[in-house]
């Protein structure tokens, strides 16, 4: 169940608080009955899966055809995704730390906004208003992406959705003003691929898994960093995601002292179009066939377990490899080091006075989306309100 957040007002708290901390992620169905709606929203999102003019026709068709298969996958991992549980836990624990280290912006209120599953962005925004933010009362909210590496198809899509619902529930469509007085002031933590705390949390999980191999074999274990793939049409447009994922991998290997051979591979390709490779499943099969059977898979772009780790990596890739030497590093989940990293990132952002990173204001070279342009203008422009 979602954590109940009591209503708060500016007058009852510190001079700059309360602060809403909104964790953004793709989400996942909590039960098998929710799979159909989850897939319908996912395949309707042209930012994530671009199908062009046929999006409205092909999206529903693909989602209906895939629903029975995906329901079986969620049934195999316990009946639903744990991503909501972990997101609510991580955000709640982070806010407890922030209340201690940043009393001037306290209390910090945790919220979760998923792109394709409950709680959806619309639900989150409605709760913000019900809890005393905006609607003439002002207040600050931080959209904290839980994709460490930025992509227009993930963080960008979530921000497009947030911007849409902000306009519908607080903006011009509601009261006729683009920037109504007393609306929520937003800022964005839009990427954090090489934050030292993130790198340390990943590195310690890798070290823990390496320790399960005999000492004489340990240095020869191949580390396979696996991230969600992207369509090449998105990559060729100039999306920064591949470079930022590679930066995370390099930072983790640097922290490990480049102790092992390693490669970066990509998972979760959907459909016949070209996607970023090499694929994780093909990579594991290739090395096992060559006799390299000691492999550690590291989910490097995910902040918690979900279907891509618990089913795709654990039950498909590792199980089909058929060798006990093929293992997976634990996901970040409830790692205290990771949660402290989240708090450190948020603390630095709250003190920094900027509404987003310098990178976020720069569009991809091949971007032609007017929605993306207007969304970026909005969030970049919020810096003017933060300095008031």
Predicted features, each with a name:
Residues 2-388:
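Active-site-proximal alpha-helix that buttresses catalytic centers in soluble enzyme cores
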């Amino acid at each position: 169940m979602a954590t109940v957040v009591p209503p708060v007002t500016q007058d009852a708290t510190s001079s700059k608080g309360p602060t809403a901390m909104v964790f953004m992620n793709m989400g996942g169905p909590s039960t098998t009955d929710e799979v159909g709606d989850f897939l319908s929203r996912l395949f309707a999102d042209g930012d994530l899966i671009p199908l062009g003019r046929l999006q409205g026709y092909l999206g529903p068709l693909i989602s209906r055809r895939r629903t029975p298969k995906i329901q079986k996958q969620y049934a195999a991992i316990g009946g639903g995704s744990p991503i909501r549980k972990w997101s609510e836990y991580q955000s709640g624990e982070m806010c407890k730390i922030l209340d201690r280290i940043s009393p001037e912006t306290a209390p910090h209120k945790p919220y979760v906004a998923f792109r394709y599953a409950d709680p959806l962005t619309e639900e989150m925004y409605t709760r913000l208003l019900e809890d005393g933010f905006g609607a003439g009362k002002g207040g600050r909210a931080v959209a904290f992406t839980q994709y460490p590496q930025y992509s227009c198809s993930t963080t960008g899509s979530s921000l497009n959705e947030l911007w849409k619902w902000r306009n519908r529930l607080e903006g011009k469509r509601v009261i006729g003003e683009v920037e109504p007085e007393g609306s929520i002031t937003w800022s964005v933590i839009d990427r954090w691929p090489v934050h030292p705390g993130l790198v340390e949390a990943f590195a310690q999980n890798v070290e823990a898994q390496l320790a399960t191999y005999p000492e004489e074999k340990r240095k020869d274990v191949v580390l396979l960093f696996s991230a969600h793939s992207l369509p090449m049409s998105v990559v060729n447009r100039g999306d920064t995601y591949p470079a930022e994922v590679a930066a995370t991998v390099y930072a983790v290997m640097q922290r490990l002292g480049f102790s092992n051979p390693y490669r970066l591979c990509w998972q979760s390709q959907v459909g016949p179009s070209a996607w970023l490779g090499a694929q994780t499943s093909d990579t594991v099969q290739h090395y096992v066939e060559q006799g390299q059977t000691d492999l550690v898979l590291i989910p490097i772009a995910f902040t918690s377990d979900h279907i891509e780790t618990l089913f795709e990596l654990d039950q498909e890739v590792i199980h089909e490899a058929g060798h006990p030497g093929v293992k997976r590093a634990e996901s970040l989940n409830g790692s205290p080091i990771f949660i402290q990293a989240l708090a450190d990132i948020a603390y630095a952002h709250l003190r920094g006075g900027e509404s987003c990173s310098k990178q976020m204001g720069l569009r991809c070279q091949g971007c032609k989306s007017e929605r993306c342009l207007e969304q970026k203008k909005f969030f970049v422009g919020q810096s003017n309100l933060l300095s008031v």
